[in-house]
């Protein structure tokens, strides 16, 4: 330790000029601080055309100017930038012209998180170039998972927070913890093994979670082995490492990144009450659409039924209606008979204590009479319906074109299917179709003559 540096330089009596003072101060500084290490953060980085590098090294309380000349700057491997934490080695010197002291550097290395940040950026760029972060590799999360694997430490607030969210929002989900170290030398290998085991278990989704910490504490989630294990998983993975401001390589590779472990649980545990409301809403919409569809189909069916004009279809409709009336009449008869019987039983029960024999006999007679009249009325009604149906069938048969053809007439049709009503509609050699009562003939016109038809009244 120098007790009296001024005595060493012979400055106890001498009066110096400014130039002399700065020169001797430079010698003193370079002698005492000739090879020192200093740690701080780069700011005001400048790279002039000379190839030298100039920047300010600072911490929370002070700053010092630094110079890294071209020959030494070429040996620095990492890219220097503002905000980078570094350790520098060099000597303290004084720029005599301004009286400013500075560090003349020969070595610059990343310091603390700075080195880790450089490694982080390098791995991030490498995996991004390989496509591990692309959206095409992401697997969508299941809407309603039933079994979820949690890869995290078995102790601490993380696992408790995740379980609490699922108990509140989706208690039916089965949670399985795959315990692993989340910090330290063994953490990387354990996390890789846990991911492989969990992916083989057939879970609906996985949560990779850890609480907050420094970049060094979270570093196992920035290891390439962990990133590739996450990418190899078939099961959808939610990465929830650190606090909201923390970002890890596993966040980029995972299918979904959650800001916190609790947020990861909420992504996979939709609120049961919300689901119930959605189900109720969908049920109401389904019922309304079914009703609308039934109404439209019924209207369409009615419209089609009104457009039907074929005699056979009309007959089938009448026959079906007759069968329906028959069944309705039978059911009405049975209901009436059952009603009468039930009423008689009730009356017998109410009057049983008084033995109303005469009234009971009258009621039985009336019941027998009704039972005898109802079948007769039913038969007469059916007979009338059959007669009415027979009459309608005869009427339809008389006006049916098929009946006319059956009496020996035919209908001539041209090649467009148009009926020939006059010889003037034909030409010699034209081919026509003759529709008969049974079958069809192909004929050819030999000649055509227009002969007026004269109707005469017979005396």
From Swiss-Prot:
Pfam families: Exonuc_VII_L, tRNA_anti_2. GO terms for biological process: DNA catabolic process. GO terms for molecular function: exodeoxyribonuclease VII activity; nucleic acid binding. The keyword Hydrolase applies. One of its GO terms (cellular component) is cytoplasm. Keywords: Cytoplasm, Exonuclease, Hydrolase, Nuclease. InterPro entries: Exonuc_VII_L, Exonuc_VII_lsu_C, OB-fold_nuc-bd_dom. It catalyses: Exonucleolytic cleavage in either 5'- to 3'- or 3'- to 5'-direction to yield nucleoside 5'-phosphates. It is found in: Cytoplasm. Bidirectionally degrades single-stranded DNA into large acid-insoluble oligonucleotides, which are then degraded further into small acid-soluble oligonucleotides. NCBIfam families: xseA. This is Exodeoxyribonuclease 7 large subunit. The gene is xseA.
């Amino acid at each position: 330790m120098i007790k009296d540096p001024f005595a060493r330089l012979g400055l106890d009596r001498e009066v110096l000029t400014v130039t002399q003072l700065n020169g001797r101060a430079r010698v003193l500084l370079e002698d005492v601080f000739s090879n020192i290490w200093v740690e701080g953060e780069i700011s005001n980085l400048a790279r002039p055309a000379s190839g030298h590098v100039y920047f300010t090294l600072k911490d929370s309380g002070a700053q010092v100017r630094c110079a890294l000349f071209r020959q030494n700057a070429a040996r620095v491997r990492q890219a220097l930038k503002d905000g980078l934490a570094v350790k520098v080695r060099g000597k303290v010197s004084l720029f005599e012209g301004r009286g400013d002291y500075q560090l003349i550097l020969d070595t610059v290395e990343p310091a603390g998180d700075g080195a880790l940040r450089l490694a982080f950026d390098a791995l991030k760029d490498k995996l991004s170039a390989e496509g591990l972060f692309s959206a095409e590799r992401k697997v969508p999360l299941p809407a309603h998972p039933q079994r979820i694997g949690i890869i995290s430490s078995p102790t601490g607030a993380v696992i408790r927070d995740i379980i609490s969210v699922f108990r509140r929002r989706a208690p039916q989900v089965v949670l399985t913890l795959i315990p692993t170290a989340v910090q330290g030398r063994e953490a990387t290998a354990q996390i890789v093994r846990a991911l492989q085991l969990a992916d083989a278990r057939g879970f609906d989704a996985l949560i990779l979670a850890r609480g907050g910490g420094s970049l060094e504490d979270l570093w196992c989630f920035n290891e390439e082995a962990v990133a590739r294990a996450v990418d190899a998983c078939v099961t959808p993975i939610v990465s929830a490492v650190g606090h909201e401001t923390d970002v890890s390589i596993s966040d980029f590779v995972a299918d979904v990144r959650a800001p916190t472990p609790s947020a990861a649980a909420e992504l996979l545990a939709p609120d049961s009450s919300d689901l119930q409301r959605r189900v109720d809403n969908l049920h109401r919409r389904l019922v309304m659409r079914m009703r609308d569809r039934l109404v439209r189909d019924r209207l369409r069916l009615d419209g089609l039924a009104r457009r039907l004009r074929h005699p056979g279809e009309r007959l089938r409709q009448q026959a079906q209606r007759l069968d329906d009336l028959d069944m309705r009449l039978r059911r009405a008869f049975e209901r009436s008979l059952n009603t009468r019987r039930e009423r008689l039983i009730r009356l017998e029960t109410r009057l049983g204590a008084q033995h109303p024999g005469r009234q009971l006999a009258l009621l039985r007679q009336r019941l027998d009479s009704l039972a005898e009249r109802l079948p007769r009325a039913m038969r007469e009604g059916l007979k009338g319906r059959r007669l009415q149906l027979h009459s309608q069938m005869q009427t339809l048969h008389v006006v049916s074109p098929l009946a006319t053809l059956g009496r020996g007439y035919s209908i001539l049709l041209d090649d467009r299917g148009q009926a020939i009503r006059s010889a003037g509609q034909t030409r010699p050699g034209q081919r026509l179709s003759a529709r008969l009562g049974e079958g069809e003939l192909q004929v050819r016109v030999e000649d055509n003559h227009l002969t007026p038809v004269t109707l005469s009244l017979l005396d």
